[in-house]
A protein has these predicted regions:
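Class I SAM-dependent methyltransferase SAM/SAH-binding core
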Residues: 50-105
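A short glycine-rich, Lys/Arg-flanked "PGG" loop and its adjoining helix->strand segment in the class I
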Residues: 129-141
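Conserved beta-strand signature within the Rossmann-like core of class I S-adenosyl-L-methionine
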Residues: 142-149
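Short, glycine-/aromatic-enriched active-site segment of Class I SAM-dependent methyltransferases
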Residues: 149-166
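Core SAM-dependent methyltransferase catalytic element
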Residues: 194-232, 264-265
Length: 265
């Protein structure tokens, strides 16, 4: 489990990351082109659909959703009040509902939403299988769930940093989790920013599936287990995990500059 892959550690990580999330993180790691490609798999084909965006953060993914769906039908959920507060500065999200909550214990009734979307959130979940089972539970029968997350890097240095930071599963794990949760027609879509050049290992995955019948997920899950750490362990996790995560920014920035120079030649 990654050092920031815990509820309290992730809460404080985003307390600080929210200050520059839209300026530094999205342009490098979760671009408008990636968002558009991923949201195609959510089947946002009717403005009247009800949609929940789990791990909505500052609303970057939500902005892509409300370009197709009436904002009054969209619910943004996040455990970080600081991220959600930043989303209020975006006028297109003014009519969205905002809920503080846990992706692994969603505060919604079973069969509540036509569409479930979650982008860049699963990597912080201590129990990703439980989170996917919750995605199944709150989606209406016949509805679609879409989850976007990172993939284990091919580069050894990046892989070591990723392992220290948070959850970076191999692509096939996403498919396994969706299938085990009960979703049908499970599909994987590879995503990458323009600077990413590895054709053999995807940068990120969008996994989608359809809920075939009403009710909760048939997945058999063990009891929840993410006991809070003591002060020293928490501090060590937070500092070391944040440092590992911060290292990705200059790496991505350098690769992005190289890619831009290559396109100009």
């Amino acid at each position: 489990m990654g050092l920031i892959q815990h509820k309290r550690e992730a809460y404080w990580f985003y307390r600080f990351l929210s200050l520059g999330y839209d300026r530094w993180v999205n342009p490098l790691f979760w671009t408008p082109e990636m968002r558009a490609q991923a949201l195609q798999e959510a089947r946002l084909d009717d403005a009247g659909l009800t949609v929940v965006d789990v791990g909505a953060g500052t609303g970057f993914t939500t902005a892509g959703i409300v370009a197709r769906i009436d904002a009054a039908n969209v619910t943004m959920l996040d455990q970080s009040p600081h991220q959600l507060a930043r989303s209020r500065a975006k006028p297109e999200l003014e009519r969205c509902a905002r809920v503080l909550g846990d992706a692994e214990t969603l505060p919604f009734d079973t069969d509540s939403f036509d569409r479930y979307v979650s982008a860049g959130s699963i990597e912080y979940w201590p129990d990703p299988e439980r989170g996917v089972a919750e995605a199944y539970r709150v989606t209406k029968p016949g509805g679609t769930a879409l989850l976007i997350g990172p993939v284990r890097p091919a580069n050894r240095v990046a892989r070591a940093l990723a392992r220290a930071w948070m959850l970076f599963p191999p692509a096939h794990e996403y498919e396994r989790w969706f299938t085990a949760a009960g979703f049908a027609d499970v599909k994987l879509t590879k995503l990458a920013p323009r600077w990413y050049r590895n054709e053999h290992v995807p940068y990120a995955i969008a996994v989608s599936g359809t809920k075939p019948r009403p009710g909760p997920s048939p997945a058999q899950l063990p009891p929840r287990a993410d006991p809070p750490a003591g002060p020293l362990r928490f501090a060590a996790r937070f500092v070391l995990g944040s440092a590992a995560g911060a290292a990705f920014v200059p790496i991505a920035a350098v690769l992005s500059l190289r890619a831009r120079r290559g396109r100009r030649r």
